[in-house]
Regions:
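Carboxylate/His-rich catalytic cores and anion/metal-binding grooves
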Residues: 193-197, 203, 259, 266-297, ...
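Conserved alpha-helical scaffold flanking the Walker A/P-loop in AAA+ ATPase domains
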Residues: 329-341
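N-terminal accessory targeting/assembly segments
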Residues: 1-187, 191-196, 207
């Protein structure tokens, strides 16, 4: 390890030379209070910025152990430190001049959700803080401008580090509130199954967002108020008593007129699998961590998935116990999404009729009379929903506005009226008595087969030059194969997409052997992430600055949408 004086001397030596001479700076340098590491140097000023990290020892940082002793506390603190550093870095961005990306200083941009990221990591055993950033090394044309880089590394970065990574320079009360909030959120999530609940929405929550693509709360948005019949009161470790709507396990139907807040409530529940920052409005909207949003995905590929619970006796004679297609219909794709969700270990489905295949969701009495059951290969979801709960322990929340077919089987019915929820279970059930109930198959479906084994791909073995590119939250490309993720609505951040790409790449190189099934492979990936770190999947210090931990459900979904993956299904 070299000293900061040696780095300054090195910069002076390479000043005004060709840009490739910046490669000489790669290495570690001891600065007062931290170690600066230049991990990867960009090829030219117009390329992706250089990767730089700082390591502050726990003793120097001085954070009390109770702020990072548990996982939820540590993630909350990491998130806050990253936000603090990012705000400081924005003040200095591009103050160092030059061509291309010269002078850029950036870290991961955190949204409303609190995610575990590779950009800031605290070691629980000693409190050491590792923060990764990207810096555009300055140049005039393609000639090194070392004096401008000196400003960044010796003035701007030290100020950001001292202002955001040293406990003595931060608001201790604010940090305590952030960690307390995380502990309260985690307490609610653990309390849900004990109370027979699958979700909780606190009174006073603000669910509407600022506008369509914004995730920030709407100003003057109507505060949520639970119906009295559904109110639950919890005693939180820090906030104390909190009251809100408890969504009970089973089948819950959300109804109401258009634009009255049905989908807004469902969207809040979708993202309630993550903790949210203070002031978001959804801090105390907590959903079962395994919840999966279901929808139709016309055109997606399906490989060796047992969809016989919903689809059988196809006219072309295709086997639905090991179904394959490169271009699924809406109903077929939604059936596959249900089975894959079960395989991924979900305990809760979230469904909006607006994004569902109608023929998958319901089949009314008139249609059943005209097209007899034996002529219809699709068993609609309404005929399996009770079975999913009683035999698999999977609760379902459905948003519906056009059909009352689910009134008969719902355990709880909530009407959204101008963003205010009302319990209309008794009223709706009484009205439903005047309408015929949809028949349910006498025999439950056979348990789906999940023993899908990926075949190894020789192109990945021993190959360290596998290219990967992400396109926001939409997709990830591995070599020339694009994995379409745009319909996975619970992906909260593009950095989770990057992590999913690395999960697939790591599995192809190290885990897929033609023997392990998909469940075992995802188990091992989670083990690597939990016991080592997400950065371990990269196998390189130059690519670990922009990932966020994805859920198990999205890891499965990514493999399921990877068209280049070849699966074999073994039956006992």
């Amino acid at each position: 390890m070299q000293s900061e004086a040696e780095l300054r001397s090195l910069l002076s030596r390479i000043d005004h030379r060709g840009y490739p001479a910046y490669k000489d700076t790669k290495g570690q340098y001891r600065f007062p209070g931290y170690v600066l590491s230049i991990d990867h140097v960009q090829g030219d000023p117009f390329a992706s910025p250089s990767k730089v990290s700082v390591l502050v020892s726990g003793k120097t940082a001085g954070f009390p152990q109770e702020l990072y002793c548990g996982k939820c506390q540590r993630i909350a603190l990491q998130d806050e430190l990253l936000r603090q550093f990012g705000r400081r870095a924005e003040r200095f961005a591009f103050k160092a001049k030059g061509s291309g990306k010269s002078g850029l200083i950036s870290v991961s941009r955190c949204g409303q959700e609190v995610l575990e990221r590779t950009a800031c990591q605290i070691q629980p055993e000693n409190g050491n803080i590792l923060l990764r950033m990207e810096i555009g090394f300055p140049a005039n044309g393609r000639t090194i401008n070392a004096r401008e880089l000196e400003k960044i590394l010796f003035d701007f970065v030290p100020e950001c580090v001292k202002a955001s990574l040293f406990y003595k320079n931060l608001d201790a009360k604010r940090l305590r509130r952030i960690v307390d909030l995380a502990e309260d959120q985690e307490y609610i999530r653990k309390e849900l199954p004990k109370r027979g609940l699958c979700a909780f929405v606190a009174n006073g929550s603000v669910l509407p967002r600022e506008f369509g693509i914004s995730s920030r709360p709407m100003r003057d948005g109507i505060a949520f108020q639970s119906p009295k019949e559904q109110e639950v009161t919890l005693e939180l470790p820090h906030k104390g008593k909190i009251t809100g709507m408890g969504i009970r396990k089973g089948i819950t139907l959300i109804v109401g007129g258009g634009y009255h807040g049905k989908s807004t409530l469902l969207k809040a529940l979708e993202l309630g699998v993550y903790n949210h920052i203070a002031g978001d409005g959804r801090e105390y909207v907590i959903t079962d961590a395994t919840a999966v949003k279901l929808r139709a995905e016309d055109g997606r590929s399906i490989q060796k998935t047992d969809i016989s619970m919903f689809i059988n006796d196809l006219p072309n004679g295709k086997d639905t116990t090991s179904f394959c297609t490169e271009d699924a219909s809406g109903s077929t794709s939604q059936a596959a999404n249900v089975i894959e969700g079960i395989e991924a270990g979900t305990s809760m489905f979230l469904i909006d009729e607006d994004t569902s295949a109608t023929n998958f969701m319901i089949r009314d009495e008139l249609m059943q009379r005209v097209i007899h059951r034996e002529m219809e290969p699709i068993t609609p979801f309404i005929e399996r929903i009770r079975e999913l709960y009683e035999n698999y322990g999977i609760s379902t929340v459905i948003v519906a506005g056009s059909s009352g077919a689910y009134f008969h089987i719902a355990d709880s019915i909530i009407q959204m009226d101008r963003y205010v929820p009302k319990d209309i279970t008794v009223l709706a059930k009484k009205e439903a008595e005047n309408f015929p109930q949809i028949s349910v198959p006498e025999q439950p479906a056979e348990k789906p087969t999940y023993d899908r084994v990926p075949r190894p791909d020789k192109a990945f073995r021993g190959n360290d030059r596998i290219k990967m590119k992400t396109m926001g939250k939409e997709s990830v490309m591995i070599n020339r194969d694009t994995i379409d993720l745009r319909y996975l609505e619970q992906i909260a951040d593009s950095e989770q997409v990057a992590a999913l790409g690395y999960c697939v790449r790591y599995a192809q190189k190290h885990l897929i052997d033609g023997k392990k099934n998909l469940i075992q492979i995802v188990d091992e990936l989670e083990e690597v992430i939990q016991n080592k770190s997400l950065a371990e999947l990269c196998e390189s210090t130059s690519s670990v600055s922009c990932m966020a931990v994805p859920r198990r459900q999205e890891i499965f979904a990514c493999f399921d949408r990877y068209r280049a993956l070849r699966l074999v299904c073994y039956r006992s």
